[in-house]
């Protein structure tokens, strides 16, 4: 919420050049998350998640305080980059704490509330009008005070979360992962030199090859435990998480209504984004409750139907309508579908995973989420199109390519969900036979 307001305020005060710098920092923050979150999560078997949570809160507090200091747009971009690191730490740590402290029968509802925190924060930003230069500073002071309070609570509460492994941390695997993913991210972003691209590709290939060999050698003690990679349910759920976050970032739901209003020379309204985030806030806990009640398949189907209907309705209304009514319906359905699927997928990826493997799978899950966001932004910027508003889609060949991409992504998402449900049904049947 804070970073969104920060970008808007500085874009107004400093012009397009400053906004471009901040957009760079936003993308760089997503890349930092992809590179580091798995390593941070894997350390959760050696260092208590509350320690990571405290570290993330300290970083967030410092970056929030730094954003209040007047300075150049470049300085502010670095503040946002550090903020992304702190947010990543708190995301991983809070997930691990929720998973370790919740019995399996109540894990769906807990994950539902955990997923709901994002739309809650974004909804608060819209209601409080954090994009206003007049409101941004007092809201920032409030966020800083809340961060300090939560940090004090974390430091003073007893630590009950699971920590335990007799294996030493796979430092070699962690270094290989950092090098490989960093090289791959640089390869995707950098356009300056074909020679550099070849070098980065070779570095990434060698690093991932060495990581594969290291994983085979260390087995369950590797950075990515070997047995996790042999679980089709986990792999399918990770793929689906990546596809979902790709679709969300590629479609750019947050700003669709703003561009729609500008295109029609209307004043942007807060109602459409409020509808998007409010629907996500409500449906996430509901999806978690239904999962705990044994309605997993219903949640998966409901999420896909809501998302497809929401995207279709939003695209149609953005192309033809001159009122917000249809747009509101599309964003309501989209927000509900996104949150419903997110809860289902995060639950699916952890189902049947042992406590020792939670850190590995948790790290992979948040990494998959960040990866989908990076790839979605990358494709959207390179294609120079906006799916929902129709910008850049006038040419028939471009439109056909984008439609084909969306069809493939939805097919991948549906296929991954089908694999998850079939594998889970097979496991349930075997457990019933054994009983």
Language model regions located:
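Extracellular/periplasmic helix-loop-helix junction of adjacent transmembrane segments
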Residues: 3-36
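Central cavity-lining transmembrane alpha-helices of secondary-active solute carriers
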Residues: 24-42, 91, 95, 274-287
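Transmembrane alpha-helical cores of Major Facilitator Superfamily
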Residues: 24-31, 58, 112-120, 243, ...
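Hydrophobic transmembrane-helix bundles of small-molecule transporters
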Residues: 131-240, 248
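12-transmembrane solute porter fold
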Residues: 1-7, 63, 221-426
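Helix-loop-helix hairpins in multi-pass membrane proteins, especially solute transporters
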Residues: 37-41, 45-171
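Glycine/proline-centered helix-kink
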Residues: 113, 118-130, 181, 253, ...
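Loop-to-transmembrane helix entry/capping segments in MFS-fold secondary transporters
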Residues: 19-20, 104-114, 353-365
């Amino acid at each position: 919420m804070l970073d969104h307001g920060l970008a808007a305020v500085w874009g107004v005060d400093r012009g397009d050049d400053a906004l471009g710098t901040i957009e760079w920092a936003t993308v760089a923050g997503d890349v930092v998350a992809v590179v580091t979150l798995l390593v941070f999560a894997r350390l959760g078997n050696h260092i208590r998640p509350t320690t990571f949570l405290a570290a993330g809160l300290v970083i967030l507090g410092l970056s929030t305080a730094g954003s209040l200091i007047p300075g150049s747009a470049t300085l502010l971009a670095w503040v946002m980059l550090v903020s992304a690191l702190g947010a990543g730490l708190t995301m991983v740590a809070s997930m691990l704490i929720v998973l370790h402290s919740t019995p399996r029968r109540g894990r769906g509802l807990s994950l539902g509330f955990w997923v709901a925190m994002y739309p809650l924060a974004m909804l608060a930003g819209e209601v409080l009008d954090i994009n206003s230069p007049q409101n941004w500073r007092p809201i920032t002071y409030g966020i800083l005070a809340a961060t300090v309070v939560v940090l004090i609570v974390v430091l003073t509460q007893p630590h009950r979360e699971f920590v335990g492994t007799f294996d030493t941390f796979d430092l070699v695997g962690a270094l290989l992962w950092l090098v490989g993913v960093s090289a791959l991210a640089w390869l995707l972003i950098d356009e300056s030199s074909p020679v550099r691209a070849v070098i980065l590709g070779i570095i990434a290939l060698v690093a991932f090859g060495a990581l594969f060999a290291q994983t085979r050698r260390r087995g369950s003690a590797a950075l990515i435990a070997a047995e996790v990679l042999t679980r089709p349910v986990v792999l399918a759920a990770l793929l689906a998480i990546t596809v979902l976050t790709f679709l969300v970032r590629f479609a750019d739901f947050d700003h669709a209504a703003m561009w729609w209003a500008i295109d029609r020379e209307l004043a942007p309204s807060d109602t459409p984004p409020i509808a998007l985030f409010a629907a996500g806030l409500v449906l996430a806990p509901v999806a978690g409750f239904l999962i705990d009640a044994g309605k997993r398949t219903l949640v998966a189907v409901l999420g896909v139907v809501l998302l497809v209907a929401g995207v279709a309705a939003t695209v149609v209304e953005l192309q033809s309508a001159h009122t917000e009514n249809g747009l509101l319906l599309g964003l309501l359905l989209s927000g509900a579908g996104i949150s419903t699927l997110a809860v289902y997928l995060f639950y699916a990826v952890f189902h049947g995973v042992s406590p020792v493997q939670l850190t590995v799978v948790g790290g992979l899950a948040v990494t998959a989420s960040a990866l989908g966001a990076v790839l979605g932004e990358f494709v959207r910027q390179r294609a120079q199109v906006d799916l929902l508003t129709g910008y850049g889609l006038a040419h028939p060949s471009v439109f056909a390519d984008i439609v084909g991409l969306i069809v493939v992504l939805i097919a991948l998402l549906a296929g991954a969900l089908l694999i998850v449900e079939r594998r889970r049904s097979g496991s349930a049947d075997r457990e019933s036979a054994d009983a």
